[in-house]
Structure formats: C-alpha cells, structure tokens
Amino acid sequence: MNKAIINDEIVIAYDVLKKSEIVENGKIKKTWRGQISTFGAAVTMGSLIPAVAFFSDQGGSSVKRQCIMDAILEILKRDHIAPEKYHTLFEYVREQGEHCREDVLNAAIVLKLAMNLYTLEKE
C-alpha cells in the first residue's frame, strides 16, 4: 500500500462511486464493503487474474460485483495508470500481468475508504 497514492486517489474514488451503481441515493449497502474486502483478500492471498475473473461475475452475490471491477478500472484510468483502451479490469490485468497487482490493490483500498464517506445501510 502506497500512502501517497492512496491520498491522491481518494478524491477520484469518491467521484467514481458517486457516478456508479454502487451508490444509490447517497447511500451504499454494507454488502459492497464486504465484497471489496473479499476481493482484496483474494488478490493478496491468491492470484490477481483469477480474483478479477471471479469478481467479474455476479455469482450468488446480492450485488453486481462487476461494478466493483468497473470502479477500480475507472480509478486506474483517471489516475493515468491504466490506458483508456481497456473496457474491463480483466482485459487490463490479463495484458499487464501480476506487475499491476499493487496498483489494483491500492485502487481497491481507496474504493473501500471512499465508501466511508457515504451512509452505509443494511440490506
């Protein structure tokens, strides 16, 4: 985790969340925080590409997990880390490989931190 990057990206993450499907009427379901935490753990304990592939599908989740992947990619694009040519986070990590792991984790961390700026609600 790079604190300087986190500080720079928190404003970006707040704006990305505001424009995403994750925020509804200025509120975020607590389920989203759980999903982003699980994603971070999957990347840290496992491998980046399989974690992104898994979270790109809704599976049995009550929320559309692809929104998290979209938000992470948008943060990376706005911070000029990921080029605009990528349409999905999976495309980006597939091409960049494991060396973009820290950038993806930083974006996930800042996304979770920015969620604290919204009202959290139970399902």
Task: Tell where the protein language model's regions lie, with residue ranges.
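The feature represents the first ordered module of a protein
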Residues: 2-89
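Amphipathic alpha-helical binding modules
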Residues: 87-123
